[in-house]
Amino acid sequence: MKPAFNPSEFIVYTDGSCHTQKRFGAWVAIILYKGSEITLQGSEPNTTHHRMELLAVINAINYVCNNTSGKIVLQIFTDSQYVVGLPAREHKLSTTHFLTKSGRTLQHADLVKSFFQLLEMHSIVLHKVKAHQSTNEAINYNELADQLARGIVRAAVQ
């Protein structure tokens, strides 16, 4: 799906990757704005795929907010059902104080709380895209983000 581009909007593509046995992960965010393309990336040991997906989105939002002024609109495209599904779970997670049914703290509660705060403060629209799908766009940014994140993980675990 090619996003309709509004000059006041930032288009963001994110992805996270994790080597499940070695628990090393990486995240990538590609930010498009007025013809510019900015790529952010990072990595962490002892992590999970969900944490990397969430960090990609949070870091993209924070980058845009820290480098602009005034009203911003972010259109975020991700293949992570986990990230896209979080806003629908906000009320339940908040009322249970981010605890699971067994009374343990929700995994990644720190990031989930930060994510919810960012959603409250800014105009953010999340779009679920299918992973590894070809598009008619000149550059498939979702696939590019995936390749970059997987490349970081591969290089680190060799």
Predicted ranges, named:
Residues 1-52, 62-64, 87, 140, ...:
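RNase H-like nuclease fold core
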Residues 17-23, 58-143:
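RNase H catalytic domain
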